[in-house]
Amino acid sequence: EIHERLVGSEMCIRDRLQDFTYIAHHYLPAARKRLTALLQNPPKDTASVAPELRPALLYREQLLASPVNEQNAMVRALSGGTVFPAPGGDPVLNPNVLPTGRNMYSINAENTPNPRAWEDGKRLAEATLKQYISKHGEYPRKVSYTFWAGEFINTEGATLAQVFWMLGVEPVRDAQGRVVDLKLVPSEELGRPRINVLVQVSGQLRDIAGSRLKLLTDAIRLTSEAGDETYPNYVASGTLLQEKLLVEKGTSPKRAREMSVMRVFGPVNSGYSTGMMAYTEHSGSWESEKEIAEGYLNNMGASYGDDENWGDVQEGLFASALSETDVVIQPRQSNTWGPISLDHVYEFTGGLSLTVKTVTSKEPDAYMADYRNRTNRRMQDAKEAIAVETRSTILNPTFIQERMKGGEGSAQMFGEIFRNIFGWHVMRPSAMDKELFNDLYRMYIKDENKLGIHEYFLRVNPAAFQAMTAVMLESARKGYWKASDEQLKTTASLHAQITREKGAACTEFVCDNDKLQSFVADQLDNSEKQTYTQNMKEVHEASATDGKDVVLKEHKLTSEQTVRKNRVNGVVAGSLVVITFIGLVVLLKKRKKNK
């Protein structure tokens, strides 16, 4: 509506409307006020409500009905009744998931990419190439993608379509719309080189879309053998290079040729994680980012391309497949998370970027494939995406004030974002604003906006604040934050104060990093240093004595309450099991008597 009203004006363009910060500062307050008033006092007659606002009333009713629907559906399921199906997903993106309390389904993987997803994927692939060419003046040789189950389901295969179009193949469908084969797009029709690809998958995606990963390997074989090309075929040349690198690593020529078309990789041992988040945050245990990359190669090096080699780990294969990578791409389809609020983004795409840089000695470009706006899919530079989320959330006083209305969980969210920021600095420091830590220092350590930051965290969740200060100090120790002596002293003093007054919450940063503890102590004056050192010594001794994690003072009561609550829940659950068992016995006896 706003776009149509301002068409032809420099005040507003479609891409700018998609920028969250622009909407937040110019239109969101008024829209929120109008919607809030409507939802708090809904009229009995909706005819007086503007047509564009009527869906909000429907969604309100469906949300209010959802808890009862969920309870009724559970009882109906336990009674052997039918739980009716409905799509699952983000209600912001797809309101059809409301009301909840129905049997969620995702998609039929065999139909992917569906026709709409195919067109979306083609557009995003071309947008990727256009963006890369505008910066580098040439086509990329290889693009490496991250595939997640959520994005695959929500876009109905648009992520897969991007890869197919990069290769220059298109789907062949049967009468039921299933994608059963692929065919080459002629080189003249494609009008550009065939771009080589690599795909890393999450465990969930591997489990629900195994047939699509095998189809992708078929696409690699098909394009590697394409002849009479008008334009370069980077897939074919990449396959030959991969074979050559494997032979150089000691693989037999026959095996090297067989594995040269493998481009799909994921967690080893049929796992579900890169395993790199904990290692990254245990930063006292590694000195160089190359150690992180080596761990990534080991943990994500299982191939998932065909039945014969499903889950196999071939030494040197993943590294050889990463060669020549010019771009890494992360899908994004939800408004509920961003690159700094979800740790899996730095874990997967950040980890992939670092590993490519380690293998090729060149950092690839990094983009987000943004599916959030169904009418305007777009590619966004990772640095821009991080900056937008950073400025609109963790450095936004209004956002911070709203989050501070919450309790322990809200405070914990800040700590998680700080850890993710550290993770990005480890994996891809070029994506981070050089002034970010200084901005965080002014916002949280100095509280220059007078938000009551210290009072809030010390009251609600001192462990989160302790972790935040520890992350900043570890970032300085590692060289990611070029802090001044004053900044270091102030941050270390605050960290020591929390430890002195509240105890030490033994997270990876606070208790498990002896090098950081020495670094913190070196920033303190003699009296603070002595007290801090003694506090940490007592924590380690206590942990060694009882073998249990140390909890902050304010959290002990919560833990006891949790234990009591769990006991009550256990009694209730046990009673339900007994009652159910008795009921089954009675039912069986009745059936036996009737026979």
List each language-model region with its residue ranges.
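Ligand/cofactor-recognition surfaces for anionic moieties
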Residues: S9-K595
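Single conserved hydrophobic/aromatic residue that forms the stacking wall/gate
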Residues: E1-G8
